Amino acid sequence: NTTATNTLSGGSRAQRGTTRAAHIVGVTVKDTTSYFGWGKASGADFTIDPGLWVIDSFGQTVIALIYNGRAFEWDASLTAATSTRATAITGTEVPTASRHMLVSTPDRHIVFLGTETTLQTVASQDPMFIRWSTQESLTEYTPTAINTAGTQRLTDGSRIMSAIRGRDAMYIWTDTALYLMRYVGLPFTFAFEQVGTNCGLIGKNAAIEVDGAAYWMSENGFFRYTGKLESMQCLVEDYVYDDINTRPRDLIFCGLNNLFGEIMWFFPTSSSEAINRMVSYNYLDSTTQ
């Protein structure tokens, strides 16, 4: 009311998360003592994963996946491409929740990792499940007798961390192991081989491939794969692992300076939630710095 009469009219109220106490609009409210408190604040901790994107090319079409979300496409061949927004890839068979995405070349299959076991059902997302499209398709993911779409579930680990393309296979890391995914054609399309255990990836951007060899940072050391798994000698390993913060693990990333033959890992120390330290490895003379 605009005049102080100690009465309220035409009001309703409710508090989210508490027992509802509402007053119908149009009825005079004289006594509002029927209320409930907000309750005690929760002291539980929780972690929100960073909103990371994966971007790959499918010819002149750019495919982008938001971490644990859906994929988008952007056509670079359009006349007004720079003023055209990316759009979600639509269709009744397109996955809507995935941890990672990669385009297999030269066979041109789109591979979703840590994705849904039941298409377009977010609740069915399995962090160890892999699904790929039929050849040359953005929208067909249901395996049939006449296409090359398919699925595979990895077994060693609790979640797929990341994947990168290599010279003759794709490298797929879980939190505990390394797998190779190779295109073999019909009838299986892809073959999977586990080539390492106790060598999982520490963060989704902590691996790189250089001259046919994969290098990565794990929870328990630095590794290389050149056809066989190798634990890399590192004189500063204790310096790194005694003071690393693994809570924001997906912020840890790997970079390459091929001018000087260096692979670099950037990571946060135990006193920081952001990147503030770097360790480098010279793959030309096999030294760490």
Give each language-model segment a name.
Residues 72-88, 121-151, 180-191, 223-237, ...:
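Surface-exposed loop/turn elements that mediate protein-protein interactions on large endomembrane-trafficking
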Residues 1-51, 78-83, 93:
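Small/polar beta-strand repeat architecture
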Residues 32-39, 95-179, 266-283:
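N-terminal beta-propeller domains
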Residues 155-289:
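Beta-sheet-dominated scaffold domains
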Residues 36-43, 84-92, 147-154, 191-196:
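A short beta-strand motif characteristic of beta-propeller blades
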Residues 35-59, 93-107, 153-166, 203-210, ...:
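Structural signature of eukaryotic scaffold interfaces centered on beta-propeller domains
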